[in-house]
Structures are given as C-alpha cells and as structure tokens.
Amino acid sequence: MKDLLNLLKNQGQVEEFDAIRIGLASPEMIRSWSFGEVKKPETINYRTFKPERDGLFCAKIFGPVKDYECLCGKYKRLKHRGVICEKCGVEVALAKVRRERMAHIELASPVAHIWFLKSLPSRIGLLMDMTLRDIERVLYFESYVVIDPGMTTLEKGQLLNDEQYFEALEEFGDDFDARMGAEAVRELLHAIDLEHEIGRLREEIPQTNSETKIKKLSKRLKLMEAFQGSGNLPEWMVLTVLPVLPPDLRPLVPLDGGRFATSDLNDLYRRVINRNNRLKRLLDLSAPDIIVRNEKRMLQEAVDALLDNGRRGRAITGSNKRPLKSLADMIKGKQGRFRQNLLGKRVDYSGRSVITVGPTLRLHQCGLPKKMALELFKPFIFGKLEMRGLATTIKAAKKMVERELPEVWDVLAEVIREHPVLLNRAPTLHRLGIQAFEPVLIEGKAIQLHPLVCAAYNADFDGDQMAVHVPLTLEAQLEARALMMSTNNILSPANGEPIIVPSQDVVLGLYYMTREAINAKGEGRVFADLQEVDRVFRAGEAALHAKIKVRISETVNDRDGGSVSATRIVDTTVGRALLFQVVPKGLSFDVVNLPMKKKAISKLINQCYRVVGLKETVIFADQLMYTGFAYSTISGVSIGVNDFVIPDEKARIIGAATDEVKEIESQYASGLVTQGEKYNKVIDLWSKANDEVSKAMMANLSKEKVIDRNGDEVEQESFNSMYMMADSGARGSAAQIRQLAGMRGLMAKPDGSIIETPITANFREGLSVLQYFISTHGARKGLADTALKTANSGYLTRRLVDVAQDLVVTEIDCGTEHGLLMTPHIEGGDVVEPLGERVLGRVIARDVFKPGTEDVIVPAGTLVDEKWVEFIELNSIDEVIVRSPISCETRYGICAKCYGRDLARGHQVNIGEAVGVIAAQSIGEPGTQLTMRTFHIGGAASRTSAADSVQVKNGGTVRLHNLKHVERVDGHLVAVSRSGELAIADDFGRERERYKLPYGAVISVKEGDKVDAGAIVAKWDPHTHPIVTEMKGTVTYVGMEEGITIKRQTDELTGMTNIEVLDVKDRPAAGKDIRPAVKMVGMDGKDLLLPGTDVPAQYFLPANALVGVADGAQIAIGDVIARIPQETSKTRDITGGLPRVADLFEARRPKEASILAEVSGTIAFGKETKGKRRLVITPNDGSDPYEELIPKWRHLNVFEGEQVNRGEVISDGPSDPHDILRLLGVSALAKYIVNEIQDVYRLQGVKINDKHIETILRQMLRKVEIAESGDSSFIKGDQMELTHVLVENERLSTEDKFVAKFTRVLLGITKASLSTESFISAASFQETTRVLTEAAVTGKRDYLRGLKENVVVGRLIPAGTGLAYHSERKRRRDADKPLRVSASEVEAALTEALNSSGN
C-alpha cells in the first residue's frame, strides 16, 4: 500500500521549466529515446489479439498491454513491478507506458526529411546552394551529384545524368566520387565547413552590388549562423534512423464484428518497414543497381508520406480513397493537436439548456433547473451526504441521489448556496460572453437569464442555448465571485460605457412613464412629497402623464466626494416623480426629469456608477428593470395597421419626382447627358424624394393635435405606438418606419449597384409583383451577408487575438516622455469626438499650459478622469499630448501609465491585465455588426460627396491650416494646395468645425476674420479640377495644334467654343510626343518664372482638359487657365465595413495607392518613357534630386515648379500605411489608422476606445529593418524585433561601438503573429509546418512569455491572478537555486553534451 501512495505522489510532481527549445534530433538522440527496434510490419495476431513480437505494437519494446501483467501471463500483480519476464521479454509495468515509450527503425539507406527539403525556403537547398529541383533529382535517383571531384575537371556539387556519369567514368576512372540519393546529399551536407563558409559570406556581402544577390547571400548566412549557434548539424536533416511513435498514440481498436479501426499512421509505418526490409534483403543479395535504386526511391517516398503526406506528388490514399493522415496533418489545422486538444479542451462539470427570461431575478442570479443542478453538483452532494451521516459510503450516496430522496434536495440547496456558476453563450466574442451568477433552483428544464445581461451575451430568447460550468476549487470560486460576477461587469471593456443597459420592453415602459401629455387628469396640481404623488396616482386621481408640481428633497454628490442636500419644488410629471423613488441618493432629480429614451437611460446608469459607486448602481439597475416592465405592461402599447399613418404629401412628392425623371430621360434620348450622368441624376432625385416622404411621414407621426385645458387646439408629441417605440429606442428605427408608412425606396442589384426604379409603395399599401420581386433580392443578400460576415468577423478576431495575446501590463511606469498628440476629431461642421472624450482615461505625457500663458494647468502624469475632462473643456484646450501604448517603452508587455484607465473598472489598469486580448476582443466583437458591402461612389452615396461650398454652422473666427493660396484682384483667396483646411474657432479659441479645401477653392474670408453662422465662406466647382495661375501675364500656347493635340468643341446650347486636349491614344502619330502647355510671358515677351524658383511658368495640360483662355489673352493672379473634368478620375469603390477593417489591420497596400512626395523640394518633369511620366523632385537643401516614374493615366495634383513637402500627396488615391510610416513617422501612421478604423465603426454606431486600436498597432510595429549594421551582429536588411535591437544597441553603446541603425516596419496582423518570438504561439496560429521547420533549424527557444504558449504547455497564463503565481514561482525557485538539481536535469544536460560532441 505504501508503495502505491509513493507512486501516486511521484506522479504529481510538475517539471519546473522556463523555456522550451526545439531542435533537430541526431541519430544518437533518436536511438537514446528508443526502447527497441521495430523490425516487422505486423501489428497484432488476428487470432489471439496479442501484439506480434518486434512488430509495430510489440509488448517487449513498448510495454505490457495490461497493467502489471506480462504478455504470457507468468508475472501478474503489483509485487513483480519492474521484473522482465524471461519467456516473453516484457517488463511488468503500468500499461500507460505504451503512451510514452518510443521505438526506432534503422533505415537501410538514408532518407531526406521532407520538411527541410520542401518547406519553403528549402533549408537543404539553401545550405548546399542548389535549387530544389536539382536536389530532388538527386534524392529521387534521376541524377548523380559529384561529391569529391578529386583531380578531375568536374566540380563539387555538379549534377550528372546517366550518360554524363558513364562518360566521366570512362574518362577519369575512379579519380572522382559521384553518387545519387539521400546518402549523396548527406555527404555534401556533412562536408560543409560552417565556420569557413560564414566567414566567406560575411566578406562577400559588402562587396556585392545586386540587391537580389545580397538577399540570397544573407539568407544563406543567416541559416548557417543559425546552424552554428544552435548546435544542430546539417547532416541531421537527412535521417538514418526513424523514430516510431508510441503505440497508444496510434491505436488499433477492435470494433464489433471482428473488424479493426486503426490510425492512419500504422499504415504509413507499415509501408516504411516493408520497403526498408525489402531494401535490406536486396542489398544482402547485391541486386542489380537499378532495382536497388528504385527501392531506395520508394523508401524515400514512404518516409515522405509518413512525415507529411501530400507535400510531394500525390497523397497516398487508404482503402477508401481518402488521403492518409500523416504526422504533419496530426498537428496542423483546426482539427490538429494545437487547436483541437491544446488550446480547445472539452470541459467536465458542464451542462447546456435553452434560456428563458427571468424578470424576477436579481442581477447576480440565474435560474438553474433542479435536475441540472443535481447532476452538476453531484460530487459536492455526495460529500455533504456522507459528512452529515445520511449515507455511509459514496456508493450509498449515489443511490440516494439516483432515487432523488427528499434529503437530497435539502442538501442540494445547501451546496448551491453562495457557490457561483459560470454561464457561457457561444459564440464567446468578448470576455463578457462568460459571466458568473449565483444559481437559484427552479422547476422546469430551461435556464433563466436576467434580462439586463442579454446585451453582454448578445442573447435573445428565441431558442438560444447556454452552457453552465461549475468552478470546482476554492480559488476558482473566488475568482468567479470577485472578477466574473455579472454585478462586477457593469461597464463594457470596449468603451467604458455601461453594458448593463435596459432594452426593448423596459425602455418602452420607462419612456412611457416619463412622457408628458397636455390636459391629462390632475394637470396643474401641487404635491407635498413623492409619497403623496404615489397615493394620488394609485387612487386614479392623477394620470401618469399629467404635468404637476411637487416638492422634493434631494441629496446630490459632487465629484470630490462631498454632498449637498436641498428641498425644492419642481415642474414635472407624475411618472417622473414615481421614477425618482428608485433613483439612489446622491443623484439630482434632473436626471429623471426628461423623457427616458435609451440614450438617456444609458447616461443615467453611467452617471450613477461614477457618482454613487458599483453597489448602488447594481441595485438601481434592477429597480429600473422592474419599474420598466411594470409600466410597459400598464401602457398596453401595441401596433395596429392604423398606426402606420401615410402622409398626404406622398402622392405629390412622388408625382413631381416622376416628372423630373421623365425630363432627364428625354434629355438622355436627345444626347444631352451621358448614361452615367443620367443614372446619377435619377438616383439623386429618388433619394431626395425618399427623404422628403420620410420627413413628411415623421412630421405627421410625431405630432398630434389635442385640446388643452383652455379649450384651444394645440400640438403635442404623438402617443402613436409605433412612433413611441422608435423614439424611445426600444425597437425599430426611422428607416424601418419609412418602409412601413413612407416608401420602400431604392433597392440594390446583386453587384451592389442601385436599381434606377425605386419601390414607391410601402408595406401598408402592399407591393406589386414587380416591386416584390425587386425587393426579394435585397432580403436574400442580407441573409447571405450575415452568414459570410459571421465567419469573416470570427477569423478577424482570431487573428487579432493571436497578434496581441502576449501583451500584458507588466510594470507601472516605463518613464517615457513620448506620446500621441490628441486633437478633437472634427469632420466637416461637426465635432465627432470632442477632445475631452478622446483623452478620458489617458495619462498626460507633457504638461498642459493654459492657452496663451506659461501656467501649467494639467501636470504630466495625470490620469484624466471625468473631473479633469470638464476642466480641460472649460479651459478651451485644443490639443494634449497623451501617453499611448504605441510609444510605451516597456520591453516585454506594456506599462500601466501608457495604457491609462482600465475601461471596465474605471481606475488605472492593474498589473497583469491582459490588455492585448481585451483590445482584440473589443475590436472583433462588434465585427458582426459591420457590413460586408463595398460602396460604389454613385447613386445615393455620392450626393453627400459632391459638396461645392463651405457653409459654417457656428459663428466664430476663421483659421486656415497649411493652406497655400494666391489673392485674386477682387480680394478673394484661391487655394493652390490640396491639404489646406479651414476651421472655425469659438470665442474660447476651441475649434468647432473643420473643412477640407480642395485645390482651386475660392475663399471669401481671411485668417482671423469673424463670420456668422450660416455664412458661405468658400466655393468651388465639384465637377472639375481647375488649374490656377499664380501670377499675371500673357498667355502663350505651346504645342497646341488643332487636330493633332487639341480639338475645338462648340457647345450646342450656349454656342461657346472650348478647346479640349486630346488623349494620347486619340492623337495622330505626329502628336504622340508633343506636350501641350500654356506658357506665361511678361509684357516684354520674355518667359515669366514661377515665384521663388528659376522654373519657367508653364502649365502642362493633361488629357481631356478644357482650356478656358485664348492665346495671347491677359490674365490675372488666381484666374483659371483650364479645367479637368472630374468624370475622368475613375470612380473608386469605397471598401466599407469588415473588409476595410481587415485591410487596415493586415496593412495591405491598396491598389493604385496615392503617391506621396519622398522628399521636400521643387517639382519638375523629366524625360517621359512609354506610358510613364518622370517626376523629379529637387530637394531645397541641394542634395541629389529624387526621381520617380508615374503611369500616365494617374492624375497628378502638382504642376511643374510647385513646392512640396515630404509626405505630401502628389497623386490622389487611397493612402498606403507603409508610405505614411516611412515618410511621416509613427504618430502620423497611428493617427491615420485609428481614424480610418474608427470611421468604419462610427458609421455603424459602434463605440470603441482608441487605445484598443493603438494596442494592436503596437504589435504591428514590433519589427524593425536594419538600415546599417554598425558593430552589431545584424545583417543589413534583416527584420528584427525592436526590443532585441534596442537591447543590442544599449550593449554596443556601453562598449563605445557603433550602434545599428534601423527603420520601423509595419506588419499586417497575420504576418506579425507568424513572426512572433514564440514559435509555439506562431505554430498554433497558421502555417504550422513552416513555423516548426524554421524553429527547429535555428534551435529556437520559447521563453513562454505570452498567454498562448502557457496554455499549450498546460500552465497558468502569466496574466491576472496567474501573473502573481508565476512571479512567486520564479522567486521561490531563485531562492532554492543552489540546493538541488533534479535527475532529469542532469540527464538532459548529459544528452545535450553528448549530442553536441557526438558525430
């Protein structure tokens, strides 16, 4: 017995390790793992079912089949443990050693390992400096390779086919050695002198000029250094011994009916053994060369199939035509070892059932069916029954539970008390998808869920199912209660706003009770206190909506923790007074003295949380819910067909639109407008009509006429049921009501383009057959979209989690002074996000001064909370530099100051918080709400984009930002730059609106002018691009010959003549190389120069430009020389929604990206090539000019002689993030990506905090490219981890050596995940084979810093409570360090020493 206890104790010891290293196994190492050689392909005896000796399941090699029993049955029981039976040779041990004991196969001829051969880039190929095809020809016995040329003219590594080989034999005899097959490759690899080669390559690289050659050499050099550093020998990539997997990991299971189910690996091993044995026999018989050669080739193919079936040639299939699953297939993909078993395990103690509503529950409770609870808590019940003496043994307890005796239920109730359970709803898209509740036993079979947590789970009660898990250990229960309880997760981690927000019925009820009605019963009465209001309402003496006065006493907490009590009389309604009864002390009456729409309720809960704290808020949320349900029941709101009131104006509006469309059709028929223009105009018209109808409808619905107390007819907000639902935010939206009572509007075709004929009917009138047919398409597309979206969104989340999983808060402060500049986010005339909102929860990086003074009003290092936000807004501060995850200088992980506030808790983030995963989930979770569509500019979308003026919304002072302009004779300014912006600042100097000014805009105000609201301050023609002169003079035409480069056009309507520049394609041969231009000459007939340069002022005219000035005409500054019609610039598709977010995170280079100026300087055009223009920028500092070839069809924004700054746009198009990083730096890139991603989410009304996006961006910017290696060991052009380079540079600078110079590189999330330091994390993500091959060759160490690696090796993750565990473990181990070295460590050290010295 004592033996047994010791045995159990020994099994429980955990290996202590800090890193995992992967490498190539030497033949000696494989033999040292092995317990014997497998010599026969047999598996088990078909009669006795016992394993065959020396076969694939041999008990002598792998261990006994039954516990403590040898095969022949001579030794049984525990007492013979460790005895080796002399009859059958089997050791008496536990049967589970068959899971760990390996064997080996001695190969009769060496075999190349397919991973190192075929996984690109081929490692064997790189080392030997041969192409993959050549090596394959050698390996598969098609050519000879020269191993030792001796004194002959042959070269080492040269390939010879049969003829050449025999010729060489005749010529040189035995002076040279050439062979084929893997042994030849092994010899060549063995002969490589790594040290000598590395030295040679290091000398060769600096002397090479060609880029491709340098790349190739540095690849080889890296590989050789990896081999040298890791202690792997190149010849180990060719196997001479093959390890055999333990038999219980490739089981053979008897099925009923005498058949067997077997793992595919057994078939693959059998082929290898068969071929190997046949080859041995052939070699013993010294068979003819050709036969041996064929057998060797077959052996190579068999081993290939075993290691990675289908990697080369056709996959070997089993009896059912299905490819066999090889060792590589076992570990890769969703069904592979990593994702199926290591990262996604099944869980015991769990149940699942349908969910129903639990409106009577408290927020921290869930209803658990008794039957389910009984099953889940069984072990606890058994224990309790035994402890109470109700059952003598566990077996008896089990019987009691099965019979469901009354005592059992009592015990169950006791066991369940204060034992939280976890509820999970798939898909778990963010951490709120699993929360803890206290179970309440209920009858029935469905789980009851509290309505307020539905939003977090995204659950509804139309048949959703949820899973229940029981936290078993005390620690697990503690964490569930303290961290996962639904009451502790009131705020969403994505944006810090409450996620416990009432929806639907509750909102409707609260809205209904806080509305006011004119002339309701009891209007105008005055009440002494809230209790009186309650009594009168219950007695039916006052209606819920009656306007009354009431005396209230309230206590209001301020931000600093003090509170003020007061009594006052307020104007309100009965309903609001009743609602105030449930509002916690500390909030003012004003928070409920308004109609409670969904936004208002959310704001109320938020305010409650910030002012009175968590506990009160939870109680309040529950009370709100109960009240809401009660009053939505009382309201009796329902929908009937008569609620859809169709506006009378609808017929008139549609009639007018139809007439206009007819007019456009007739214009098109007579050729005045093009097809495209007609289409755009018609769609514009119908969009306008639709808007008008819906405006009329909403106006109609939202107001109703009533008689007031004085008998007059007045308007009040409508009590129409449908309007109330939409207005409160309970259900439905204006767009949906429009389809019910307005008109359905325009529909889209399958390709996303809009159909010209709209559906003029609505659902109340009913659709005609044609209209129904048109609309089916959109409905079906909606469903198909949803299915696609879910998969794509899930994949995006997976990639995001993977790239950010190892980002954990590891220290309080990294001490950096850098940060990001935050300004209010202003689009057009709207402040989309005020500065206060953007800096909330961030730490200030540099002191903030009061505008115009030197007074510090917010010191650096302040965590901005709501109080500070008010302060910043009050002092009209325009910009603040805040700490950001991107600029954090913590080596591994991130510091709390750079991250700022933990959004879900409302205080500074704790050390150990897994901020990377939270960021990934926050971005990925709303992904399913994004659209999959790409928008075509055209139709409804383009109406907004064709702005032609700036009309200011608020009065204020004009500010012009980086605007280059010239002043016209009439005093107006004309913009001659593209990045110019016009902003309006209010009296405090805060910018309230900001507009982009296109080139050629005429601005009627100057910097510092005061303007009134509604003033139009700038105008331009949206349909053409002008070319504006910057000087006055006389026009001279250059190269403008009619019929050759230009054509004259007379407008039919106006009779005016235009000159149009011909496209190069349409010109005759004589005009192909002529560049038409307009030149400016002075009074004296000399060429004028552009101001500030010595470039002649001439404006080259692009194709299709319309010239508006005559030859010899006098023109003034700011006049327009020519216009380029806008139609020519191709209509781009705007990628919207999910694909856009994915593109940004993958850092994909857009097609036809905008071209940015690489240097600052003056523009000129050089000699053109076929189809391309040569753009030359001469830098102002006199360094070498920069040249770039640009395709002719790209429309350039710059003219000869113009000044540009580095990073300015030369040719429009979507921005390329890589260019922004290279030319403008990290903070410009951060601003661009954050804004672009936020735009997509904002369009769907999703709020995500900027710092989540910055957190992911930090991971995308992990790598740098070495520009100059200095004295470091890096190679120029290498991509290295930033931290790695910084550490190396610190070391070099302390030794007074030259440091390496580098540039930051932006990697897409997939690439960043695959290039992470941890090979376990990368291998479990994608491209498993490639990652593992790379890691093995370089002998990589994984220091298990991330979360994923630790989950894979089965440890606690180093985040949250696990971080404490890990640091304690390290501390303990460091304290015990000198004391003991375990036997396994000694053994490991010995084998490593043997391996490195062996061979």
From Swiss-Prot:
Similarity section:
Belongs to the RNA polymerase beta' chain family.
Task: Please spell out the taxonomic lineage of the organism that makes this protein.
Answer: Bacteria, Pseudomonadati, Pseudomonadota, Gammaproteobacteria, Pseudomonadales
Q: Which residues bind Mg(2+)?
A: D460, D462, D464
Q: What class of enzyme is it?
A: transferase
- Keywords, in A-Z order: DNA-directed RNA polymerase, Magnesium, Metal-binding, Nucleotidyltransferase, Transcription, Transferase, Zinc
Residues binding Zn(2+) 2, per UniProt: C814, C888, C895, C898
List, alphabetically, the Pfam families matched: RNA_pol_Rpb1_1 (PF04997), RNA_pol_Rpb1_2 (PF00623), RNA_pol_Rpb1_3 (PF04983), RNA_pol_Rpb1_4 (PF05000), RNA_pol_Rpb1_5 (PF04998)
Query: Which protein is depicted?
Result: DNA-directed RNA polymerase subunit beta'
Q: Name one GO biological process term.
A: DNA-templated transcription
**Record's HAMAP family?**
RNApol_bact_RpoC (MF_01322)
Assembly, per entry: The RNAP catalytic core consists of 2 alpha, 1 beta, 1 beta' and 1 omega subunit. When a sigma factor is associated with the core the holoenzyme is formed, which can initiate transcription.
Report the co-factor binding details.
Answer: Binds 1 Mg(2+) ion per subunit.
Source gene?
Answer: rpoC
The cofactor named in the record is: Mg(2+); Zn(2+)
